[in-house]
Structure formats: C-alpha cells, structure tokens
C-alpha cells in the first residue's frame, strides 16, 4: 500500500471487532480521556515508540482523530514508517460516537 485509504466507521468497527486491524486515536489527551473507543491505542508523539514496538508492521492500522482530517496526515506518516496497510477513519471519533454511542469509554469514571 503506497497510500493510506479512507474507511467509514462501520468498516472500522467491523475490522476492529474481527481482530483484523488495530485502532489508534490521535486526539489530545483531554479529549481521549473524556471519551474514546474501547481498545483504541492513544497514539501521541510520546507513545509512538511503544506502539511501533508492540505492533507488527503487517497488522493493518486504522487512525482516528476528531472529524477525519488530522488522521490523514498521521496515516501517511505511519505508512512511511513501514506499516503495510493504514486507514484513515472518515468522520473520526465524532462519527464513531454517533454510530456507536454505547461503545465509548471514559478514562475518568464517566
């Protein structure tokens, strides 16, 4: 894959629950803490090394941001780091929350 692909939240949801891809959330720490997709890895500059060490380059990666814009740059960056397949989630966490409101986890006991 030379270029990342965009997928919708339904496709991302299916891939994640089938174990066919990992989901990373690149939003700021406060937004992530207020609500995120269970099982999503919070990918930041500080956690990038851990993510790359713990995840195979062959495992597809789905990148989620706020609305599906910032994730595109992060997806391209991950491709450049050597990941075989990277996807940007259209609509980001906003779309995920609208489609799957029961599947939102809060870090602060919410």
UniProtKB/Swiss-Prot annotation:
The keyword Transferase applies. Its EC number is 2.8.1.1. PROSITE patterns: RHODANESE_3. One of its GO terms (cellular component) is cytoplasm. The active site is at 65 (cysteine persulfide intermediate). It is found in: Cytoplasm. HAMAP family: Thiosulf_sulfurtr. Transferase that catalyzes the transfer of sulfur from thiosulfate to thiophilic acceptors such as cyanide or dithiols. May function in a CysM-independent thiosulfate assimilation pathway by catalyzing the conversion of thiosulfate to sulfite, which can then be used for L-cysteine biosynthesis. This is Thiosulfate sulfurtransferase GlpE. It comes from Enterobacter sp. (strain 638). The gene is glpE.
